[in-house]
């Protein structure tokens, strides 16, 4: 059984989105900005709070981890904690404090964080910070942002994540420096893949057109590097399953169906409920003007999902976020009389609508 498996991989883990390379392709400007701010800790100063935003797969996490790894080579005094902030304020606080999740009150946990910070300057990286803010994360941010020795580095797919902070006191004390990540281009994705291919695969097991095709398809998915890596690893899995010694373009084409399902599931999971309802409205109305989508959304939110109506301005912001994630396309169709451009919103032409609708229904 196992003897017949082709030996394509040297190290399959290199294709994981969790892998942090020794060197980064592109993102030099973002590395420079993050390292400049966090580097103040080497001078004995607390770095300013940072907010790193960009669409999924744009390199926020891997870039931040890369800079943190480099920083740790130059200091042993800093207390650095990386967490995925996808829980309640209490759950996130216990992770930062490394405290048990039972038996202590919230303020007791905050005090333990203070004790850790007193050991030296503390950097807290909160990946997916929007998820805790969508619950009760305000109250944790309230305390952390007021600690003189604490630097908060928040990562989010949401461009408007600051709008999720309802406490004006938190907004005043947090005031992060914002660093934005743009989607990767096809050439950038190809460079990323080529770097990892050298470590991941044995020589000569990829046909020449495999990497360019993975990069081109991922560029159509709003430049998502994780999608490109998934395509490459799934294609290799298919080749191994078919007992082939080489990964071909046809394997990549076959892998798109498997990766599509995973991509859609992951894309929907990272949306807030109001974004899911809005996307559902776009999908079921087959597109239309923002006004038409606005009416459809409010009707669905009230009648079907028990949600609250949004202002048209806020709804337009959410549509722009969905466009950034590659889930919808906004088409300019002409100019109105004295009212600027007219535009329509349609589902992404690169995503299977039936798979998308099913994923939304399952998540709501």
From Swiss-Prot:
The answer on whether this UniProt entry bears the keyword Transmembrane reads no
Identify the keywords attached in UniProt to this record, alphabetized.
Answer: ATP-binding, DNA replication, Nucleotide-binding, Plasmid
- State the Gene Ontology terms under molecular function: ATP binding; ATP hydrolysis activity
Cite the InterPro entries for this sequence: AAA+_ATPase, AAA_22, Cdc6_C, Cdc6_lid, ORC1/CDC6, Orc1/Cdc6_arc, P-loop_NTPase, WH-like_DNA-bd_sf
Q: Does the keyword Metal-binding apply?
A: no
Top-rank taxon of the source lineage equals Archaea
Which BP terms does GO give this entry? DNA replication
Q: Which Gene3D superfamilies match?
A: 1.10.8.60, P-loop containing nucleotide triphosphate hydrolases (3.40.50.300), Winged helix-like DNA-binding domain superfamily/Winged helix DNA-binding domain (1.10.10.10)
Provide the residue positions that the database annotates as binding ATP. 58-62, 184, 196
Pfam families in the record: AAA_22, Cdc6_C, Cdc6_lid
Function recorded in the entry: Involved in regulation of DNA replication.
The family database entries (PANTHER family) matched by this protein are listed as: CELL DIVISION CONTROL PROTEIN 6-RELATED (PTHR10763), ORC1-TYPE DNA REPLICATION PROTEIN (PTHR10763:SF22)
In the record, the note on similarity to other proteins reads:
Belongs to the CDC6/cdc18 family.
List, alphabetically, the NCBIfam families matched: orc1/cdc6 family replication initiation protein
Q: What is this protein called?
A: ORC1-type DNA replication protein
Native organism: Methanothermobacter thermautotrophicus (Methanobacterium thermoformicicum)
Question: Gene encoding this polypeptide?
Answer: cdc6
């Amino acid at each position: 059984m196992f003897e017949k498996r082709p030996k394509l991989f040297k190290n399959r883990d290199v294709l994981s989105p969790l892998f942090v390379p020794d060197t980064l392709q592109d993102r030099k400007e973002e590395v420079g900005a993050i390292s400049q701010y966090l580097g103040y800790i080497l001078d004995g100063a607390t770095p300013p709070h940072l907010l790193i935003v960009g669409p999924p797969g744009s390199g926020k996490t891997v870039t931040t981890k890369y800079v943190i790894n480099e920083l740790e080579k130059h200091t042993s005094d800093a207390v650095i904690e990386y967490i995925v902030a996808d829980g309640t304020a209490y759950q996130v606080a216990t992770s930062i404090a490394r405290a048990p999740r039972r038996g202590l009150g919230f303020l007791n946990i905050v005090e333990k964080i203070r004790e850790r910070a007193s050991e030296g300057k503390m950097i807290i990286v909160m990946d997916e910070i929007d998820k805790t803010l969508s619950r009760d994360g305000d109250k944790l941010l309230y305390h952390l942002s007021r600690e003189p020795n604490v630097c908060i580095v928040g990562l989010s797919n949401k461009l408007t994540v600051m709008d999720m902070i309802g406490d004006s006191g938190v907004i005043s004390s947090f005031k992060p420096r914002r660093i934005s990540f743009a989607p990767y281009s096809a050439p950038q994705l190809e460079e990323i893949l080529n770097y990892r291919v050298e470590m991941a695969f044995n020589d000569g097991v990829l046909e020449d057109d495999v990497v360019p095709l993975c990069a081109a398809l991922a560029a159509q998915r709003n430049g998502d590097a994780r999608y490109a890596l998934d395509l490459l690893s799934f294609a290799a899995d298919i080749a191994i399953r078919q007992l082939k010694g080489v990964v071909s373009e046809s394997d990549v084409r076959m892998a798109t169906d498997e990766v599509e399902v995973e991509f859609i599931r992951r894309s929907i999971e990272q949306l807030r409920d109001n974004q899911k309802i809005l996307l559902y409205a776009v999908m079921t109305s087959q597109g239309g003007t923002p006004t038409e989508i606005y009416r459809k959304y409010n009707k669905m939110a009230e009648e079907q999902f028990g949600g609250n109506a949004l202002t048209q301005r806020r709804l337009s912001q959410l549509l722009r976020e969905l466009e950034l994630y590659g889930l919808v396309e906004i088409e300019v169709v002409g100019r109105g009389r004295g009212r600027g451009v007219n535009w329509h919103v349609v589902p992404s032409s690169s995503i299977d609508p039936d798979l998308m609708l099913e994923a939304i229904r399952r998540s709501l």
